[in-house]
């Protein structure tokens, strides 16, 4: 039997990068996946790729920074499928600048998507999970939440906040049958990262004890584990998937 057979999963930011890898892996393991993303073009390409392999997947254009949009998308999903079993809070953006140059808009944009978006999705979707007595919520943090990073005050603040949200929701929802955990990726070879100059990529690899960048599929595997029954007794944890950067 597949590990997520008959499960209904929402993956935010599922059109590209880590979310795309998770969407592919989750459908391969039997889940019906709802991709919530703003990028319709890439979302539909991911849907077509998954459907070609026989997976069950749907694209929904949702701005997770908008509570009203998340609430409406949640209601539509529950009306169609009866429930949502798994939430992967993966959507995120960057607006990098040093604190001296960072604008209030750059700060707020990242807060809205990376932190408020996690709250919006967790609040709307967890209500149904509590009612059913079952749920898995996995939030995407980052290793930079644990050690900081130059030029990313906004991003680091959100990813540290995600860990705090994760620990708090784990306490609030655990007794209701809902586990809440986080994954903190390190340097991952997404399409965007692979376009960086060779010297930058080399310096990133040198910081990793394993000597290489991670693959999106390796982060998706961490999501899959935490969403599966094998992780039923893991709650409030942050799993670093970083090749040993944080140890």
Question: Which ranges hold each PLM region?
Answer:
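Canonical Rossmann dinucleotide-binding motif of NAD(H)/NADP(H)-dependent dehydrogenases/reductases
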Residues: 3-34
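The beta1-alpha1 cofactor-binding region of Rossmann-like NAD(H)/NADP(H)-dependent oxidoreductases
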Residues: 40-41, 61-72, 104, 217-218
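C-terminal substrate-recognition "lid" of short-chain dehydrogenase/reductases
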Residues: 81, 122, 130, 134, ...
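Catalytic Tyr-X3-Lys loop
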Residues: 93, 100-119, 134, 138, ...
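Substrate-binding pocket helix/loop in short-chain dehydrogenase/reductase
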Residues: 98-99, 106-111, 193, 200, ...
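Active-site helix of classical SDR
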Residues: 122, 158, 166
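Alpha-helical segment proximal to the catalytic Tyr-Lys
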Residues: 127, 171-175, 232
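Residue(s) in the substrate-gating loop at a strand-loop-helix junction
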Residues: 142
């Amino acid at each position: 039997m597949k590990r997520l057979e008959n499960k209904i999963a929402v993956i935010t930011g599922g059109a590209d990068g880590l979310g795309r890898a998770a969407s592919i892996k989750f459908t391969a393991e039997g889940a019906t996946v709802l991709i919530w993303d703003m990028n319709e073009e890439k979302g539909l390409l991911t849907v077509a790729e998954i459907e070609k392999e026989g997976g069950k997947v749907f694209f929904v254009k949702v701005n997770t920074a908008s509570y009203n949009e998340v609430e409406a998308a949640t209601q539509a999903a529950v009306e169609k499928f009866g429930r949502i079993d798994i939430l992967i809070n993966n959507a995120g953006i960057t607006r990098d600048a040093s604190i001296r140059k960072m604008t209030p808009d750059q700060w707020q944009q990242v807060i809205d998507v990376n932190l408020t978006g996690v709250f919006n999705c967790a609040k709307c979707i967890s209500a149904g999970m509590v009612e059913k007595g079952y749920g898995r919520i996995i939030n995407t943090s980052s290793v930079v939440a644990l050690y900081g990073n130059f030029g990313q005050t906004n991003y680091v603040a959100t990813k540290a906040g995600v860990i705090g949200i994760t620990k708090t929701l784990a306490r609030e929802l655990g007794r209701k049958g809902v586990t809440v955990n986080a994954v903190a990726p390190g340097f991952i070879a997404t399409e965007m990262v692979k376009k960086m100059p060779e010297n930058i990529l080399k310096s990133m690899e040198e910081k990793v004890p394993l000597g290489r960048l991670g693959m999106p599929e390796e982060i998706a595997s961490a999501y899959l584990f935490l969403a599966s029954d094998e992780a039923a007794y893991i709650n409030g944890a942050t799993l670093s998937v970083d090749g040993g950067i944080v140890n």
